[in-house]
Amino acid sequence: MTDVTIKALASEIQTSVDRLIQQFADAGIRKSADDSVTSQEKQTLLTHLNREHGSAPDKLTLQRKTRSTLNIPGTGGKSKSVQIEVRKKRTFVKRDPQEAERLAAEEQAQREAEEQARREAEEAAKREAQLKAEREAAEQAKREVADKAKREAAEKDKVSNQHTDEMTKTAQAEKIRRENEAAELKRKSEEEARRKLEEEARRVAEEARRMAEENEKNWSETSDSPEDSSDYHVTTSQHARQAEDDNDREVEGGRGRSRSSKAARPAKKGNKHAESKADREEARAAVRGGKGGKHRKGSALQQGFQKPAQAVNRDVVIGETITVGELANKMAVKGSQVIKAMMKLGAMATINQVIDQETAQLVAEEMGHKVILRRENELEEAVMSDRDTGAAAEPRAPVVTIMGHVDHGKTSLLDYIRSTKVASGEAGGITQHIGAYHVETDNGMITFLDTPGHAAFTSMRARGAQATDIVVLVVAADDGVMPQTIEAIQHAKAAQVPVVVAVNKIDKPEADPDRVKNELSQYGILPEEWGGESQFVHVSAKAGTGIDDLLDAILLQAEVLELKAVRNGMASGAVIESFLDKGRGPVATVLVREGTLHKGDIVLCGFEYGRVRAMRDELGREVLEAGPSIPVEILGLSGVPAAGDEVTVVRDEKKAREVALYRQGKFREVKLARQQKSKLENMFANMTEGEVHEVNIVLKADVQGSVEAISDSLLKLSTDEVKVKIIGSGVGGITETDATLAAASNAILVGFNVRADASARKVIEAESLDLRYYSVIYNLIDEVKAAMSGMLSPELKQQIIGLAEVRDVFKSPKFGAIAGCMVTEGTIKRHNPIRVLRDNVVIYEGELESLRRFKDDVNEVRNGMECGIGVKNYNDVRVGDMIEVFEIIEIQRSID
């Protein structure tokens, strides 16, 4: 029997695919809906079901009802319909094993009897034919002897009776002729009868041989087809029901034919009866066959599906992420084949593991299928396209980012421009997050972004460079180019933003502006007087020198860039900074790029959405709208967005929520799919990782940028022996949930410019958690370094403390060989490890067991004194050897 799929088998036995798959799984066979099932697997399932639920019932009774309508002609040419219901009850009885064996023995005996009868019939026919031939030969011989005797007698009579008259001779000749003709006729009739008898015997023998061969063939087919009997209990009821349906259709068809033939040709009633009777006999034969008759061929129950002879290439549609099992179903192959293909490509995955689009595309193409990549952001594109944007572009204010090394005077320079003292508000005078301000000058408005200069704030500086039009690079004239200065240059070049250099602290006596120009020229920043494109302005944020020149240079550069933006229409911009305020909720600092942002607009911001409930400028004043290049703080988002996210005003809040949820799910799936895979090449590397200490940290900060900066800095401190693990991080105060998480994971609670609330402090006191507050990032990183250094295993170092020369060797019954020594260097101490040197080569390393001076045990012997040394488990001490005594000291390691 050909293989069938799980779906086809479930449809055949009228059960669900999931139930059949579960039954196969219970039987120890893992299958999916499109897998093929062999006859052996069917037999295994049947055996399992019989063992679990008991064998099939010995008797099966089917009750069938067939309803039909019969039109009977009535009076007046009218006909009325009569409802006919045919009820049938059929019982199928399963033979028990003893009866089956008895029937098999009877059939075997019947076949042997038929074979014996056939052989006896053939032998009897042969004997009869032989006897007839012998009788005919004997009769022929008698006739020939009689004819010869008659001829001799006739000749004698002719010779002796020559005198008989002519009439007598004529009468005798006539008599002989008639006798000869009668004998010839009798001989021909006997030969004809013998030929017919031989033909009849041959026909009987041939018929017996044919019947015996047919019986043998039917028996062999019945015994050699285990498929028909293997799934007998599974398919008997369906086959019987199908046979009854066929029987009903045949009977109904016969009735229809009989009625039509009766109306057209009344004389053929007998033919109708014979035809319907033949149909019923055929239906009964089908039912008997459905019950498992042994002389029925199983071709009618064979499956029509044939397994494809070659692989079928399909069009596989792949989304952003897909599991291995889904990919296998799309390609109509088993999951194990996909896993094997991935192992050949160097990646290991389970059948439920999520893989990204690129990996799925490689696997599908490797298996010979055509890949169609599906774009899943149609909803997002539809929402973004349904926006009102103005057509007329107007000049806008430049967005200027002030970048440079830490303590080079960036914030002080901006403070002088704004005529405020903001630097005092920053902890330690260091800018902890991006400040966005716009100032009005005599020549126009300028928007400033102040970025941190510390090494930990790389991502914040990168965001500032991407959202800006002009970069003002602040370099201290007395300090020159520093690491963060170089990094700021790289960010500006990556964003393709023009650079204006402000040489600050020009009023200091040790200021050297020419040195700054020379150092910057090494990184591609050339002044205009040297043929470059960058303007150099000498300023002093403390004295206010050159500030107007710097503003003029910025506006001049903006005129060259011809900065324009659409003022009317729905606004779009970028998140500069975000944080969680305890009284106001999520707050985002947004820089508007195009359009006008109004209070009450529906905004979509990365994974978050919401309606703008309030807008404030950098001074904390309420505003109703904000145009291009204006930074504002907005309230009303569903959560704290990530810094750098795009902010877009949309029409429908419901659509905005759908897009935000879709982005969250997509981000989660992509993040899961791109996690580190267990590849073959790094499997052993993962297995050989030894004992690694971990410093678990729960981090809370005031703004999102500080969280990112501190997380990056702490993760960079990880080494092969000690790893920093950020268990949880977020914006806002330390809550009870954070304290519970720290207690469960044995983590340190770190608060950066935030404090713990009352409920969190109770948990911290109850669990004795380590809680630390910081306001300067330097102190935080240094203390985490110290904590990590305490987890490093100490370094072991051997320090030589004494050296003794063997002058003589004595024998002791208790310690064996005793070396009489002179201490030449340092001090010899008892129970310390020693080395025995011979010709400056170490020949033994062990422990000093006994140390005596004269006959007294001593703990140490100083330089220039004689002593006796007993080496533990070593007796091969010779004169001239050197005994070196050392001790092992531990050196505490630290993280640089």
Curated annotation (Swiss-Prot):
Which keywords does UniProt give here? Answer: Cytoplasm, GTP-binding, Initiation factor, Nucleotide-binding, Protein biosynthesis
Sites binding GTP sit at 404-411, 450-454, 504-507
Under SUPFAM superfamilies, the record lists:
Initiation factor IF2/eIF5b, domain 3, P-loop containing nucleoside triphosphate hydrolases, Putative DNA-binding domain, Translation proteins
Give a yes or no for keyword Lipid metabolism in this entry: no
Tell me the segments the record calls region G4: 504-507
What domain of life is recorded for the organism?
Bacteria
Q: Name the job this protein performs.
A: One of the essential components for the initiation of protein synthesis. Protects formylmethionyl-tRNA from spontaneous hydrolysis and promotes its binding to the 30S ribosomal subunits. Also involved in the hydrolysis of GTP during the formation of the 70S ribosomal complex.
This chain's protein is named: Translation initiation factor IF-2
Q: Tell me the organism.
A: Klebsiella pneumoniae subsp. pneumoniae (strain ATCC 700721 / MGH 78578)
Q: Provide the organism lineage as a comma list.
A: Bacteria, Pseudomonadati, Pseudomonadota, Gammaproteobacteria, Enterobacterales
Gene symbol here is infB
